[in-house]
A protein has these predicted regions:
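Active-site core of metal-dependent hydrolases
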Residues: 1-54, 68, 145, 161
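Divalent metal-coordination and catalytic microenvironments
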Residues: 4, 18, 60, 72, ...
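Short, glycine-/Ser/Thr-/acidic-enriched flexible segments
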Residues: 9-11, 30-33, 72-76, 89-91, ...
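Histidine/acidic-residue-rich catalytic or RNA/ligand-binding cores of hydrolases
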Residues: 16, 35-41, 73-92, 154
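Short acidic/histidine-rich active-site segments
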Residues: 27-29, 60-83, 136
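C-terminal cap of metal-dependent C-N hydrolases
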Residues: 89-103, 108, 113-118, 122, ...
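Short alpha-helix capping/helix-loop boundary micro-motifs
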Residues: 124-129
Length: 161
C-alpha cells in the first residue's frame, strides 16, 4: 500500500488525491501543536499563513484520505496517550489545552484512536492480526485509571506519563 510519511503540508488540490489513488497519509500526531521548533525553525521559513496549513487532519479526513498515525520515536515521545491526545486538543501535551493550534483541524477521540490503531495496522498489512479488539486478533493492553473516551481531551495526555 502506498504511504506518504510526514504528510504534514498538503495542498488543497492534493487532498482528494489520497483517496483517489489509495495513498495512506501517515502523520506524526505529536507535531500537531505549535511547538518551539515550529515557531523558531519552520514558521519563519514558510510564513505564518502556510505554517497554519500544516497537519490539517479534519480537512484531509473530509477529503476522504485514510490517515494513519506513527510515533516518530525517538524524535518524539513514544507515549501513545500523548500521541492520541494532541490531535484532539491541538495543544502542547505539557501545558494542556492552553493555546490550541488551528483547532478547526482537531479530531475526535474516536478518530484519533482509530488512526493510531486500526488504520496503522492496515498501513502495515497487519489488519488481520491487529488494530481492533476482536476474537483471534493480537493486542497489547494498557491499564488506565479512567476511560479515555469519557475524559476531557486535556486529560487524555495525562493518563500515562
Amino acid at each position: 500500500r502506498p504511504v506518504i510519511v510526514h504528510a504534514q503540508l498538503i495542498r488543497d488540490e492534493d487532498m482528494p488525491r489520497f483517496a483517489q489513488l489509495g495513498v495512506i497519509a501517515n502523520i506524526q500526531p505529536l507535531w500537531c501543536y505549535l511547538d518551539p521548533m515550529n515557531k523558531e525553525l519552520i514558521a519563519p521559513r514558510i510564513g505564518s499563513e502556510r505554517n497554519n496549513q500544516q497537519y490539517r487532519l479534519r480537512s484531509m479526513l473530509k477529503a476522504g484520505a485514510m490517515i494513519a498515525f506513527g510515533s516518530d520515536w525517538p524524535v518524539t515521545s513514544h507515549v501513545p496517550m500523548q500521541a492520541i491526545g494532541v490531535p484532539v486538543t491541538r495543544s502542547n501535551p505539557a501545558d494542556g489545552v492552553t493555546h490550541p493550534w488551528v483547532f478547526k483541524e482537531a479530531l475526535t477521540m474516536d478518530e484519533s484512536l482509530t488512526f493510531y490503531t486500526k488504520n496503522a495496522a492496515y498501513q502495515l498489512f497487519r489488519e488481520d492480526e491487529y488494530g481492533v479488539l476482536e476474537v483471534g486478533k493480537r493486542a497489547t493492553f494498557l491499564v488506565l485509571d479512567s476511560d479515555p473516551a469519557q475524559n476531557p481531551a486535556a486529560k487524555i495526555i495525562e493518563l500515562v506519563s
